[in-house]
Amino acid sequence: MSILAEKLSSILKRYDELTALLSSAEVISDIKKLTELSKEQSSIEEISIASKEYLSVLENIKENKELLEDKELSELAKEELKILEIQKSDLETAIKQLLIPKDPNDDKNIYLELRAGTGGNEAGIFVGDLFKAYCRYADLKKWRVEIVSSSENSVGGYKEIIALIKGKGVYSRLKFEAGTHRVQRVPETESQGRIHTSAITVAIMPEVDDVEVSINPSDLKIEVFRAGGHGGQCVNTTDSAVRITHLPTNISVSMQDEKSQHKNKDKALKILKARLYEKQIEEQQLANAKDRKEQVGSGDRSERIRTYNYPQNRLSEHRINLTLYSLEEIMLSGNLDEVINPLIAHAQSQFE
C-alpha cells in the first residue's frame, strides 16, 4: 500500500470511530464533547468521501490488472484500466488539495476596509468603484454586505468604507485582497487627458468573538464627541460619536454612523477586536514565512499587490505575475474569481 493510501485509510478509520462515538450515550450526554467531535468529523468529511472513492478505484485497478492474464477478459480489462487510471489521477489531484492544512479563519465572515491613499479625490472615487466590485462579487457568491461605517469626500468618493460581509467561505476567498491597490486612469475632471496614478489600501479582517480576542478594559481609552457632517458641520446635538483606542498597540477606531452612542461604541469595539486579530495574523504569517517556499502576500496594507490600468483595460496582479486584459468587464460584473482563483491555486501550490 502506498503512503497516500495508508494516510487515507487512517483518515477513514478515524471518521468511522467518530461516527461510533457520536452515537454513544456518553458523548450525547456531554454537549461540549459532542460539539468537539462533531466539528472534527465535519472537518474530515469531504476528504473521507474522496478517500473511500480513491481506495475503491485502487482496488478496481488491482482486480483489472489480474484480469489481463485472462484471454477472454483482457481487452475489456485494458479499457476499464484506462478509465480507472484517469479517475485515479483526478482523485489524487483533488485529495492533495483537501490535504492542504486549512486556514482556521477560512469560514469566518470579514470586515472589509477600503481607505483612500495617495491621489486625492481620484483615490476616493476608486474606493467607491472597488467597493461596488466587491459588492457585485458578494452578490454572485450569495453573501450579505452590511456597511458598518463610511466617510465620503467632497466629490462623491470615499475617504474610507468599512463593511461586514457574511456568507460561506468569505475569508477564504477575499483574504488575498489585503494590500495596496493602484489605479491608473484619466480623471473625469482632467481636460488634458493625462493619466493619474492613485492608490487605496484594502484590509481584510476576520470577524471574531470574545473568546478569540480578549481585551482588558483598563487597556482601552474611550472618548465621546459630537458627530460631524461635511465641512465640519454638526449633525448631532448629543455626544453620540465614539473613539476607542487600544493603548498597548495604539490602534484606534472612531464610529459616528449611528445616532446612539451605545451602538457606535458596540460597532467600534467589534472593529477594534477585528483589527487586533488581524495584527495577530500578520505576526503569525511573518513568523511562519520562514517555513514556506513563498508567500502569496504578507497581507500588509503597504504591500502593492495589484494595478488597475484603465487606458489599457489591464489588471496586473503583481504577486503571481498575472495580467488580464478584461479590467472593465471584471469591475462591472464583479467576477473577481478571474484573479482570486489563480491566487488561491498559487498559495496551495506552496504546500506541495
Swiss-Prot record:
Q: Indicate yes or no for the key word Membrane.
A: no
Q: Which InterPro entries match?
A: PCRF, Pep_chain_release_fac_I, Pep_chain_release_fac_I_sf, Prokaryotic/Mito_RF, RF-1
Q: What is its main location?
A: cytoplasm
* Disordered: annotated segments: 288-309
Q: What are this entry's molecular-function GO terms?
A: translation release factor activity, codon specific
Query: N5-methylglutamine occurs at which residues?
Result: Q233
Assigned GO CC terms? cytoplasm
Q: What's in the keyword line of the UniProt record?
A: Cytoplasm, Methylation, Protein biosynthesis
PTM details?
Methylated by PrmC. Methylation increases the termination efficiency of RF1.
Q: Which domain of life is it from?
A: Bacteria
Subcellular location per UniProt equals:
Cytoplasm
Give the Basic and acidic residues compositional bias ranges: 289-306
Name the chain's protein: Peptide chain release factor 1
